[in-house]
C-alpha cells in the first residue's frame, strides 16, 4: 500500500490501535500474548502504532515499551494525554501542567525519549484549546514529541488550534457507521495539511459482521452502553451489515476488509487504526490493503450503511458530552 504522510513521516496508512489489548471491551490477553501480537503487527508491515495514557491506566503504553523497545526505530509512535482513568472513569484535564506531566509519564512507560505524535485526547471545556496546544508546542520544542494532534474535535476548534501551532493530525471516530467527520472536519484537515486518523473504523467490531450476540458480552463491555448496540437497534443494524457481507463476498473479500478499504478511499490524507487482540482478525484487517474499489462500488457501500440507515445514536447522552465533533 502506498504510504501517506503523518507528522512529517511517511507511514503505512493502515496502522494499529493498541486500546483493545487492555481496555474497553471484554477479556484481555495475557501480557505475553499481547506482546506477541504487537510484534506480529510490525512483522505484517504496520509501522504506525497508536496508544494513550487512558488505555488500561497506562498499561497499553507499558506493554508497547516492554515488548517493542528493541524495535523502536521500526515504527511511528502516537500516544495521547489529557484524558486519564481515575477510579474507573475517564477524567478530562487539559491544563498545561497536566499535559507536561502526562507526556513525561508516557515517555517513561513507553521506554523512549520521543513520541512521534501526541494528541490531546479530549478537549477540556474548562481550558481554552490554545492553552493546551501551547503546552504541547513546548513539548515539541523540547524534543519530547514530534507533532501535535487533537482528538474528537470540530473543524472550528481545529482552526483555532492550528493558529497557535500547526496541527499534524486529528483523530476522530470515522467509519461507514459514523460519518460525522464528513460534515466539515475531513475537508478542513485537507485544507490545512493535517492528517485525519480514523479510530474505530470497524465501528467497535460491528462492521466485521461477526459480532452477533451483544447480550452475551461481559457486563463491563462498553458496547452495552452504546445505543446502536441496544436490543432495540442492533437487530436492524445486523441486517445492514449482513448485506455488506454479501457484497464483500461477491467482490472476493470480507466485510472488515471492505469497510477499511472504503475508509481509506475517502481521502489521501486519511489513516485508519483498527485495533484487535486477535491475530487472525489483524490478518483479516491487513487484507484491506489489496482491496481496490471503483467509484460505483464505493458509492454502493457508502449508500448501504451511513448516518441515515444506521439505527441509534453513536453515544449515549453522558458519552456525547465528552466529544465535540459536529452532529448531523
Each PLM stretch: what is its role?
Residues 1-75, 328:
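N-terminal binding-site loop/beta-alpha segment at the start of enzyme catalytic domains
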Residues 7-25, 78-91, 114, 119:
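N-terminal small/glycine-rich loop or linker at the start of catalytic domains
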Residues 9-14, 45-48, 72-75, 112-116, ...:
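Short, well-ordered coil/turn segments that N-cap beta-strands
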Residues 16, 49, 64, 77, ...:
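Conserved, mostly hydrophobic/aromatic
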Residues 19-21, 52-54, 80-84, 120-123, ...:
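Active-site beta-loop-alpha junctions enriched in small/polar residues
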Residues 25-26, 86-180, 184, 194-195:
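Glycine/proline-rich, positively charged
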Residues 181-218, 254:
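Aromatic-lined glycan-binding groove of carbohydrate-active enzymes
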Residues 191, 219-246, 250, 265, ...:
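Terminal-tail/helix-coil boundary detector
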Amino acid at each position: 500500500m502506498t504510504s501517506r504522510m503523518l507528522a512529517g513521516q511517511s507511514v503505512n496508512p493502515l496502522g494499529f490501535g493498541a486500546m483493545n489489548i487492555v481496555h474497553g471491551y471484554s477479556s484481555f490477553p495475557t501480557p505475553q500474548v499481547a506482546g506477541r501480537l504487537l510484534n506480529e503487527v510490525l512483522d505484517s508491515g504496520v509501522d504506525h502504532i497508536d496508544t494513550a495514557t487512558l488505555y488500561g491506566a497506562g498499561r497499553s503504553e507499558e506493554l508497547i515499551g516492554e515488548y517493542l523497545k528493541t524495535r523502536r526505530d521500526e515504527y511511528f509512535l502516537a500516544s495521547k494525554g489529557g484524558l486519564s482513568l481515575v477510579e474507573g472513569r475517564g477524567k478530562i484535564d487539559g491544563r498545561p501542567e497536566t499535559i507536561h506531566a502526562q507526556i513525561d509519564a508516557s515517555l517513561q512507560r513507553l521506554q523512549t525519549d520521543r513520541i512521534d505524535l501526541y494528541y490531546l485526547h479530549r478537549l477540556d471545556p474548562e481550558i481554552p484549546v490554545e492553552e493546551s496546544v501551547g503546552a504541547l508546542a513546548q513539548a515539541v520544542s523540547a524534543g519530547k514529541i514530534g507533532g501535535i494532534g487533537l482528538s474528537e474535535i470540530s473543524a472550528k476548534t481545529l482552526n483555532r488550534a492550528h493558529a497557535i501551532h500547526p496541527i499534524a493530525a486529528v483523530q476522530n471516530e470515522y467509519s461507514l457507521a459514523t460519518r460525522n467527520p464528513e460534515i466539515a472536519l475531513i475537508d478542513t484537515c485537507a485544507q490545512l495539511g493535517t492528517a485525519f486518523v480514523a479510530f474505530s473504523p470497524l465501528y467497535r467490531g460491528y462492521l466485521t459482521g461477526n459480532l452477533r450476540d451483544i447480550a452475551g458480552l461481559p457486563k463491563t463491555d462498553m458496547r452495552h452502553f452504546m445505543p446502536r448496540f441496544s436490543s432495540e437497534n442492533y437487530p436492524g443494524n445486523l441486517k445492514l451489515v449482513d448485506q455488506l457481507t454479501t457484497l464483500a463476498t461477491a467482490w472476493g473479500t470480507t466485510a472488515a476488509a471492505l469497510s477499511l478499504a472504503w475508509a481509506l478511499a475517502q481521502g489521501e490524507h486519511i489513516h485508519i487504526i483498527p485495533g484487535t487482540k486477535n491475530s487472525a482478525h489483524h490478518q483479516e484487517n491487513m487484507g484491506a490493503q489489496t482491496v481496490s474499489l471503483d467509484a460505483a462500488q464505493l458509492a454502493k457501500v457508502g449508500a448501504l450503511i451511513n448516518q441515515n440507515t444506521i439505527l441509534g445514536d453513536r453515544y449515549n447522552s453522558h458519552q456525547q458530552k465528552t466529544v465535540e465533533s459536529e452532529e448531523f
